[in-house]
C-alpha cells in the first residue's frame, strides 16, 4: 500500500500543476524516500535512485506494481527478484521535485523565440532549457536571474531552432 503524501520542500503550490501524473511520479510524490528513477547500470542490474536511501525497501515495494502490471507470471517473478536486490543510489532531487522545478522554470522561459524546449533530465538531475542560438542563454538568464533557483539545477543548451517536418 502507498503511504499518505509526504510533506516536501516542493514549489508546486506556486503554480498550476499538470494533471494525470504517471505511476513513477505518483510514487515520488507519495512514498517516503524521494524516488527519482529506476535504471539499469552498466552490468544490467537495477539501480533505484532516491533522495533518502534509508527508505530503499519502501520504494522498492512501491515499484512492484507499475513494473509488473500486465506481465506474465514468469516475467513478473523475474522482475520482482531483480527489484528486491536493486542497488539504492542517493541523488539530490526526487522526480517530483525535478518536475515541479521544471514547471516553475518553464513559466518564466517559454514564450519567446529564444527558447525551443524545456525538460527534465532525471538521470542527470537537472532541468534542461534548449535555446535556438547563442543569444538564447542571455535571454534565459535574464528571465531566471532573480528567481532563486538552486545553483546548477538549470542547464542551458544551444540546440538550434525547431524545424517542422
What is the predicted function of each stretch?
Residues 101-104:
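PDZ domains, with a preference for the canonical peptide-binding region formed by the helix
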Residues 1-19, 78-93:
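N-terminal presequence-like segments and adjacent domain-start helices
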Residues 14-21, 53, 134:
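Soluble non-cytosolic domains of exported or imported proteins
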Residues 2-4, 147, 158:
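Compositionally biased, intrinsically disordered/low-complexity regions enriched for serine, proline
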Residues 29-98, 111-142:
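Short glycine/threonine-rich beta-strand-turn micro-motifs
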Residues 18-20, 24-31:
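Short, flexible domain-boundary/linker segments around small modular repeats
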Amino acid at each position: 500500500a502507498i503511504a499518505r503524501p509526504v510533506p516536501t520542500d516542493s514549489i508546486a503550490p506556486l503554480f498550476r500543476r499538470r494533471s494525470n501524473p504517471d505511476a513513477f511520479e505518483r510514487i515520488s510524490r507519495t512514498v517516503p524516500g524521494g524516488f527519482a528513477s529506476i535504471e539499469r547500470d552498466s552490468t544490467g542490474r537495477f539501480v533505484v535512485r532516491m533522495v533518502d536511501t534509508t527508505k530503499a525497501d519502501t520504494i522498492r515495494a512501491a515499484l512492484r506494481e507499475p513494473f509488473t502490471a500486465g506481465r506474465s507470471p514468469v516475467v513478473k517473478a523475474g522482475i520482482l527478484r531483480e527489484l528486491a536486490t536493486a542497488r539504492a543510489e542517493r541523488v539530490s532531487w526526487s522526480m517530483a521535485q525535478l518536475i515541479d522545478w521544471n514547471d516553475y522554470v518553464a513559466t518564466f522561459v517559454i514564450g519567446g523565440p529564444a527558447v525551443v524546449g524545456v525538460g527534465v533530465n532525471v538521470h542527470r538531475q537537472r532541468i534542461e532549457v534548449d535555446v535556438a542560438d547563442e543569444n538564447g542563454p542571455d535571454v534565459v538568464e535574464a528571465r531566471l536571474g532573480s528567481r532563486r533557483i538552486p545553483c546548477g539545477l538549470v542547464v542551458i543548451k544551444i540546440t538550434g531552432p525547431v524545424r517542422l517536418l
